[in-house]
Amino acid sequence: MEFGYFTLSDNHYDDNTRSSNQFVADITAEALYAEKVGMHSAWIGEHHFNSLGVLSCPDLVLAYVAANTTRLRLAPAVNVLPLHHPIRVAEQWATLDLLSGGRVDFACGRGYDKREYLPFHVSFEDNQGIFEEGLELVRKLWQTEGRISHHGKHYRFDDVRITPKPIQRPLPTYVGSFSKPSIELAARLGCGLIVAPFAAAMSFGGLKQVADLYHETSAKHGKAPGRLMCSYFTHFADDKAQEDAARARQIRYYKECVIPAFPGDPKSAPPSYRYFIDIVDRLHKVKPEDLTENSVLLGSSARITETLKKVEAAGFAEVILYVNVGLKPHNQVKDEMARFMTEVAPAFASSRATAAA
């Protein structure tokens, strides 16, 4: 199992004195450090208007990271595809794949925050259809050598051929999923799947249930399943005081960042987001003692390793680590990244663990 760096650039906290610019600089440094300590990949989320996160252009940050690394794989987590024209998305990520020497993994999703849709004049209510049509177009634009035309419900164009083409054929593509329709889409298209354990536990019962559903659905469509990945909030704690602080940090993230961003109001949540109502209700009620291995990696190196062995057994090929969550200081984030790769990663045969220099 491989391990990567992950962030949603959460900075929306009531008493936060860390500037957006400083956090983007920290994230960039952490992504570079991921290669130094032996991580496999860096996955950077897309958020707009500081509604949850402050990093709106993961493609630009990853282009900088690409120029300053040699082997680290580079990915958005995720590209909010309905906010962008699929032609432009195909061009941007194909270009980064070329410049990085074929190191891009492309992950996309619908997002979940209506506040990010309104200024772009994109329909939040119709974004399932926009997303599906857009994803199929991006993949077609990458894979087709000649010119293509398209006349769909949401996008129409004639005689288009993008350049450059990606080095990787096919370019690895993942669907970010909180729901059964997204799993269905990933399976139907033969895409990989990336999930959040806390949401998987609430919606499906756990990661194994998600993996089973994905494999069953892939078989139904006659497709070989893609690669399974998950993100995990990560906190090292060696005593009760450290564990209590980590739990408080995680709860604060849910309360101040996630709940305001999720479509949890029964009066306004579109039909394709109704499952978020239950997730938000549970997050409102969550207590520090409710944080288990279903949602976080928290505790000693041995405890974290034990949890990840179960994730590996469920069929997941990579875990991306959300270490810099909840205003965790930059130096602590780097220390925990290095500790993970030194004390946890070596227990997994395919990891590329190296000691921090």
Where does each model-flagged region fall?
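Internal, glycine-rich beta/alpha segment that forms the wall or movable "lid"
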Residues: P82-G192, G205-E216, G222
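Alpha-helix-loop-beta-strand connector modules within alpha/beta enzyme cores
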Residues: L52-P76, I130, M337-A353
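Glycine-rich, proline-tolerant flexible connector loops at the mouths of alpha/beta enzymes
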Residues: S41-V65, V80, P197-F204, P266, ...
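Hydrophobic faces of well-ordered beta-strands that scaffold small-molecule active sites
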Residues: F3-T7, A42-I44, L74-P76, V104-C108, ...
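Active-site mouth loops of central-metabolism enzymes
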Residues: N11-A25, N79-I87, I167-S177, H235-A237, ...
